[in-house]
């Protein structure tokens, strides 16, 4: 297992070591010990899974403290463009976004720390996404940023006029008006 740092501090791509042969493959998607050896000490408490059709866009979501979540995101089937936006007001990369292609084929994962908004778009026919969280869902602390905020200039890999977006996500504020407490 190895970690690929991004230009945003604390936001990392995790690449597992895959063992393959004529039968298929095996890999550890998460090991508390190996993560700790890599300097990542997180106690995950909840796993979430979603299934989405091509053109679906989910996000950008976050939870405010004290229920802020770190997420470890991976794709079980299909392909997504996974996006994280830095909401930490004291960070030199505040308001900057990072995106990465996650797929069942490349087996990469994105570790999204507390203080970030997270979302993804589905670019394959369907996608199953699983993510581990270090805090439970708390409706009262949820927040979000509109996916098409022009100041973020995110390339979702699709025509946004055709995107399948929930009503809830369509009415989220731009980053300048979000209720982030980070």
Kindly give the residue locations of the regions a language model identified.
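Non-catalytic, conserved peripheral segments adjacent to functional cores
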Residues: 1-105, 126, 133, 138-182
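Conserved metal-binding segment of the jelly-roll/cupin
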Residues: 102-125
């Amino acid at each position: 297992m190895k970690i690929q740092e991004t230009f945003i501090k604390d936001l990392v791509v995790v690449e597992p070591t895959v063992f393959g042969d004529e039968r298929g493959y095996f890999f550890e998607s998460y090991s508390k010990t190996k993560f700790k050896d890599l300097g990542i000490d997180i106690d995950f408490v909840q796993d979430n899974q979603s299934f989405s059709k091509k053109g679906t866009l989910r996000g950008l979501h976050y939870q405010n403290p004290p229920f802020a979540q770190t997420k470890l995101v991976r794709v079980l089937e299909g392909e997504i463009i996974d996006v994280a936006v830095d909401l930490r007001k004291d960070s030199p990369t505040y308001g900057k976004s990072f995106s990465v292609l996650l797929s069942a084929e490349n087996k990469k994962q994105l570790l999204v720390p507390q203080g970030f908004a997270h979302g993804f778009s589905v670019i394959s026919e369907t996608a199953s996404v699983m993510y581990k969280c270090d805090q439970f869902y708390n409706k009262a602390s949820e927040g979000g940023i509109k996916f098409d905020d022009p100041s973020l200039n995110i390339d979702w890999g699709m025509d946004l006029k055709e995107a399948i977006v929930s009503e809830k996500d369509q009415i989220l504020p731009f980053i300048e008006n979000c209720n982030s407490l980070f």
